[in-house]
């Protein structure tokens, strides 16, 4: 007893004394503080193991502080601490189901919307049915409109009708030219027959040469070439037949020449030199000699 009195005076508790657990654990408060009137005496009296455990020496252990309410409930039941609020009245499985871990939703990063796929990629290939005959494409319009050409036989020529005498028909005779018409010309009140006028000449080369008759009373020159003529003529690069470069004089132009010579008193029975009249009355042409 003295020992107990001395120890109590020193503030120490005796070993045989009833141990009162501290109101709070040493830095291991798992739950919020509970008032003293809410003690679980009915649990201690009902369970002999728990009642006996309160008489045992309590040795605090340093445990890491749990970070979730589920861990708090399991640690309280494992250590036999009666500070839990109402956990002793429920089975452990029900407590774990009530305090399941509910993960907090994590914010998801919003990705930019992907561009829509082109329509060509989204189109699925057409379904091909089996045992369906494939029709060939229709021919082109040109081929439809055209028809194969059919060579028509040539019609035979009609035979020539036989003559009345029974002789075979002769070949057609070549066409002959009719006689030239005598063209008269009235010069200064005198009727002049041009067919009786002598052939015209030209002395452009130094020697008088005859002219060729052209048309009705007209004349053309054959000596007035590009080399020897005083009045050069163009050369034909593509001569055809007997065509040559020369000068010609129409019937009306030649009539003017005759009127001028008759007014001057020229004798028209003499050949007329047309050298001085080509430049004024003649024209350069590609003519054909007949």
Swiss-Prot record:
It comes from Oryza sativa subsp. japonica. Residues 60-90, 102-183 are annotated as: Disordered. This is Barley B recombinant-like protein C. Keywords: DNA-binding, Nucleus, Transcription, Transcription regulation. It comes from the Eukaryota. GO terms for molecular function: DNA-binding transcription factor activity; sequence-specific DNA binding. InterPro entries: GAGA-bd_tscrpt_act. Transcriptional regulator that specifically binds to GA-rich elements (GAGA-repeats) present in regulatory sequences of genes involved in developmental processes. Belongs to the BBR/BPC family. Residues 104-116 have a biased composition (Pro residues). GO terms for cellular component: nucleus. Its main location: nucleus. It is found in: Nucleus. SMART domains: GAGA_bind. One of its GO terms (biological process) is response to ethylene. Residues 138-158 have a biased composition (Basic residues). It holds the Pfam family GAGA_bind.
